[in-house]
C-alpha cells in the first residue's frame, strides 16, 4: 500500500486579511458554554411571538380574519 507524507511546510497557509483581523475577537469565545440556561427563555419567548406573528399573517392571507374597512380583490 503506497502512502505519501506531506510536510507541514508545504501546506498552504490561510491568507491574513484586514477583515479577518477585525473579526477575530468575535470568535474568541468559540466553544465556551455559559453555565445554566443562559438566554434560552428569551429565545423561547421570541420563537413563540414569531409563531403567533406567522399565524396571524397566514390567517390574513387565507381571509379567515375579517378586516373591516380594508378592501381586497
UniProtKB/Swiss-Prot annotation:
Top-level taxonomic group: Eukaryota
Keyword line: Chloroplast, Membrane, Phosphoprotein, Photosynthesis, Photosystem II, Plastid, Thylakoid, Transmembrane, Transmembrane helix
One annotated Gene Ontology cellular component of this protein: photosystem II
InterPro entries to which the protein is assigned, alphabetical: PSII_PsbH, PSII_PsbH_sf
Single GO MF annotation: phosphate ion binding
Entry PTM: Phosphorylation is a light-dependent reaction catalyzed by a membrane-bound kinase; phosphorylation occurs on Thr residue(s) in the N-terminus of the protein.
Pfam families: PsbH
Region span, Disordered: 1-23
Localization per Swiss-Prot or TrEMBL: Plastid, Chloroplast thylakoid membrane
Transmembrane segments: 41-61
GO process annotations (BP): photosynthesis; protein stabilization
Membrane disposition: Single-pass membrane protein
Main localization, broad class: plastid
Modified-residue entries (Phosphothreonine), positions: 3, 5
Keyword presence, Magnesium: no
NCBIfam families: PRK02624.1 (NF002728)
Role summary: One of the components of the core complex of photosystem II (PSII), required for its stability and/or assembly. PSII is a light-driven water:plastoquinone oxidoreductase that uses light energy to abstract electrons from H(2)O, generating O(2) and a proton gradient subsequently used for ATP formation. It consists of a core antenna complex that captures photons, and an electron transfer chain that converts photonic excitation into a charge separation.
Family: Belongs to the PsbH family.
Assembly information from the UniProt record: PSII is composed of 1 copy each of membrane proteins PsbA, PsbB, PsbC, PsbD, PsbE, PsbF, PsbH, PsbI, PsbJ, PsbK, PsbL, PsbM, PsbT, PsbX, PsbY, PsbZ, Psb30/Ycf12, at least 3 peripheral proteins of the oxygen-evolving complex and a large number of cofactors. It forms dimeric complexes.
Protein name as annotated: Photosystem II reaction center protein H
Native species: Triticum aestivum (Wheat)
